[in-house]
């Protein structure tokens, strides 16, 4: 049996508890609906994360192969010089957006992909293979930024799902059962008190009749 609440067994408390149970059940339904919606959203984004991870893995493999070919073409020393001469890319701006009531990151950044002239190294000291390697790594950066946003969103959704689940379970298995058990107890106690009053009045009536 669920633990009873520490309240007086009165009709006022009975009415109050019935109202609280009604509100608790309404809150439980809303939280359960929220939990279900969060889980659906989580798995939708999870599928996107899996796809991005697979694509990122492929792109990184392509990028490192292209880098090896560029190194063969111009040599490691020259490749390092070229990398140091590259102009810094655009800044990444991290904002927030709302997903099912959860604040998640929104990474705003223009594509990292640039033309050869925008990268800042000299044409004469480079080669098509260096350009290809740079292009491949720029593709990797684009995917990595998107994946970072998606994975952080997943983490925050997972935390919110866990918090919501605890609230749902608390209402379902502790709070509502305690209130319902207390309502049952108060009803029984009021019935007992009513019977006691009835028999008390009956005895009083019998005594009065016996004296008259």
Swiss-Prot record:
Q: Which organism is it from?
A: Thermococcus onnurineus (strain NA1)
| Alphabetic keyword roster | ATP synthesis, Cell membrane, Hydrogen ion transport, Ion transport, Membrane, Transport
What NCBIfam families does this protein map onto? PRK00373.1-4, V_ATPase_subD
The UniProt gene name for this protein comes to: atpD
The family classification in the record reads: Belongs to the V-ATPase D subunit family.
Tell me, how does this one assemble? Has multiple subunits with at least A(3), B(3), C, D, E, F, H, I and proteolipid K(x).
- Which molecular-function annotations from GO does this UniProt entry contain? ATP binding; proton-transporting ATP synthase activity, rotational mechanism; proton-transporting ATPase activity, rotational mechanism
The residues the entry assigns to the signal sequence are: none
Tell me, which GO biological process terms does this entry list? proton motive force-driven plasma membrane ATP synthesis
What the entry lists under Gene3D superfamilies is as follows: 1.10.287.3240
Classify the protein's membrane topology as the record does.
Answer: Peripheral membrane protein
Subcellular compartments? Cell membrane
What name has this protein been given in UniProt? A-type ATP synthase subunit D
Entry's HAMAP family? Answer: ATP_synth_D_arch
Has the keyword Membrane been applied to this entry? yes
Q: What does this protein do?
A: Component of the A-type ATP synthase that produces ATP from ADP in the presence of a proton gradient across the membrane.
UniProt xrefs under InterPro entries? V_ATPase_D (IPR002699)
Q: Which residues form a coiled coil?
A: none
Q: Which Gene Ontology CC terms are recorded?
A: plasma membrane
Q: Does the keyword S-adenosyl-L-methionine apply?
A: no
């Amino acid at each position: 049996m669920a633990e009873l609440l520490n309240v007086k067994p009165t009709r006022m408390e009975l009415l109050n508890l019935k109202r609280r149970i009604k509100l608790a059940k309404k809150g439980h339904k809303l939280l359960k609906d929220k939990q279900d919606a969060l889980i659906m959203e989580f798995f939708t984004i999870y599928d996107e994360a899996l796809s991005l991870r697979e694509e990122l893995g492929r792109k990184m493999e392509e990028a490192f192969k292209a880098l090896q070919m560029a190194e063969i073409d111009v040599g490691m020393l020259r490749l390092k010089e070229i990398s140091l001469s590259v102009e810094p890319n655009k800044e990444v701006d991290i904002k927030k957006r709302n997903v099912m009531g959860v604040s998640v990151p929104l990474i705003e950044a223009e594509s990292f992909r640039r033309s050869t002239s925008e990268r800042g190294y000299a044409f004469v000291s480079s080669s098509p293979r260096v350009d290809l390697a740079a292009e491949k790594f720029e593709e990797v950066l684009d995917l990595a930024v998107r994946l970072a946003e998606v994975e952080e969103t997943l983490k925050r959704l997972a935390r919110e799902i866990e918090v919501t689940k605890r609230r749902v379970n608390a209402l379902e298995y502790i709070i509502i059962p305690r209130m319902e058990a207390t309502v049952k107890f108060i009803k029984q106690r009021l019935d007992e008190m009513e019977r006691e009053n009835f028999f008390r009045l009956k005895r009083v009536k019998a005594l009065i009749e016996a004296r008259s």
